[in-house]
């Protein structure tokens, strides 16, 4: 499924924040936070150990660009949580693909995203911006 998501993001380009030859960073279609970004290898990889030397070498470039864009969108250092997602070790390795998820609770300068009842109780997140708008703001940051 995630392979299809990445392929669609590369095709549409509306939600892409940054990309290089080996990685793509995008605001997911069903983002839960205004500035949630997923960074994934362009070619499917199950886990960090499966990265090629070229993919490993290209990661810092896109990671730094994403962090600069997050900091630049409001002109302040953006607080964030970063998580690596990898495939299970033994069974089901085809069920998940490696990607790095960055989430910020900030939704505007001086404003945090607090979960409403529907979000915390039911997991039905309400967004302040469309993911395409968030991605556009991040792309517009002058580096």
Predicted features and spans:
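HIT superfamily nucleotide-processing domains
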Residues: 1-143
């Amino acid at each position: 499924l995630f392979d299809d998501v990445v392929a669609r993001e590369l095709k549409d380009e509306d939600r892409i924040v940054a990309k290089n030859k080996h990685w793509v960073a995008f605001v997911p279609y069903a983002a839960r936070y205004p500035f949630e970004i997923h960074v994934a290898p362009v070619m499917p990889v199950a886990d960090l150990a499966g990265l090629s030397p070229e993919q490993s070498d290209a990661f810092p470039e896109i990671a730094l660009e994403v962090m600069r864009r997050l900091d630049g969108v409001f002109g302040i250092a953006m607080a964030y949580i970063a998580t690596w997602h990898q495939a299970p070790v033994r069974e089901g390795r085809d069920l998940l693909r490696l990607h790095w998820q960055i989430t910020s609770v900030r939704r505007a300068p001086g404003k945090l995203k607090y979960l409403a009842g529907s979000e915390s109780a039911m997991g039905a997140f309400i967004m302040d911006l469309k993911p395409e708008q968030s991605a556009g703001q991040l792309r517009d940051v002058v580096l």
